[in-house]
Amino acid sequence: IINGKFGESGKIVLLEEKIDGPEISIFALCDGKKYILLPSAQDHKRVKENDKGLNTGGMGAYSPAPIVTDEIHEKILNQVMYPTMNGLIEEGSPYLGFLYAGLMIKDSEIKVLEFNCRFGDPETQPILFRLNSSLVELCNLAIDDKLDNYSIEWTEKHSCGVVIASAGYPEKYESNKEVSIKENNNEDLKLFHAGT
């Protein structure tokens, strides 16, 4: 906008409502006709502690999201997920795969920020860590249009994921650094790699 820094895309400005509040992620596995909701998760996008610094893809996440009370969960189902999934079916665009809704909660009101046709990162890791069923079996059931008679088993435990990033992330960051991790004998601790 200023001095043409953004080129053609900076010539038009779109003003939107500023919304504020905690952001949560809700995922559904869909087979084109039916869908199964996964537990909620909440990630933290700022690079520094106490919600400071630049936004990132996510510096950590936990599941379930404590802000998702029974009341909020019902609102999410009835105001967002059911209308979306049923709308896709009614319009002749049934969806097969994982659908991810990024939502913001403010004063018990739900605002939809985005929908993605994928899992979210880093929210997926804490969610899947709570899964007692086979992810491969779930995906195969979705492909075969057989989700209606399946019940996913989840642990009641809470799960947390922490991202460790190179110095300087998310801007110019160090690369080609050795990562050393002591042997992990704790079954409640899993290590996931990305960009290593």
Q: What does each model-found stretch correspond to?
A:
Residues 53, 62-66, 186-196:
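Glycine-rich phosphate/nucleotide-binding loop
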Residues 77-99, 116-189, 194:
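Active-site "cap" helix and flanking loop/linker of ATP-utilizing ligase/carboxylase catalytic domains
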Residues 1-125:
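Internal nucleotide-binding/catalytic subdomain
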